């Protein structure tokens, strides 16, 4: 569940949720993503606008909700008990039921088929995909569940939150398509916003804090609280591996600051074996906390078949969270666009975050003989190389 203070932020995912709610599909929608990316707030906002009756059940905060499902004998019994629990009348055809934090009651995901088949109400589910619950959610009944993954706000969402209009974006797209120079004033404004984005990032709570206070210290406090929450999740959801998970998580900023930005297993432990701790890396990725980016033997199609699973970079899900882990002076240096400091890690993290938010699988290419490409992606049947320059190069 997320703070409702970010309810006025425009999110790209809102349109996808609207399409689902306006359709006559006999499916439920599962909205996934890391904690604090804005899932709960957006679903609540869109659901209350689209349906006269909006019923919300949080399996993390409400232990009675978990017991309700576990003791129900069938879908009709569940709906009867749900109506009693929430104290509201469930009106057929006019009620949206929002089941939040479903990782706490993962059986509800596989049972959604029967609730959908019952046909009286519409359903949206949300969860953070933490730990082993991921495989259960992904094995949900085919044909009864659509999945929408949410990410932190991308640069366009951030710019719109800061007042950039459609006209400006139309100008930028037109210049890109026609390979023309962007208006100098527009360019300056967008670069200022981009540098600000590198500090604030895309976590809705951090963005809302900046828009309200325009105080980067307060933004950093919000970011630190999110990082602390992630560490608590690590300890809670995988107690056996929590020490390794914490070490991996804490090492991400320094590993990205190294020359090749690759995650070096020996930096964790001299005898560290990937096979032994593969689940720890997988957990961070599945939780949406980290973005693994794999080296490919050759930058050729299909990239997935060229992937080297033992060679990878590990980015944080949000560039603002990464910036918050570095020394305080980096914020001012980023804002000023100083060129004598290497911001490569921050710029690459922003690029990884943007690519992931737009559905691209993340790869890079590094060969002693042929050189290095920061990212390689598949786009419309082609492999595109991406080189990220922070300004110092």
What does each of the following model-derived ranges do?
Residues 1-20:
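N-terminal pre-Walker A segment at the start of P-loop NTPase domains
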Residues 31:
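Hydrophobic anchor at the beta1->P-loop junction of P-loop NTPases
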Residues 39:
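Conserved lysine of the Walker
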Residues 42, 46:
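Hydrophobic positions on the alpha1 helix immediately C-terminal to the Walker A/P-loop
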Residues 61-92:
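Short glycine-rich substrate-engagement loop in P-loop NTPases that contacts/grips substrate
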Residues 122-128, 149:
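Structural recognition of the conserved hydrophobic beta-strand(s) that form the central parallel beta-sheet
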Residues 134-258:
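Interdomain motor-coupling "hinge/lid" segment immediately C-terminal to the ATP-binding subdomain
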Residues 208-382:
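Accessory nucleic acid-recognition modules appended to NTPase machines
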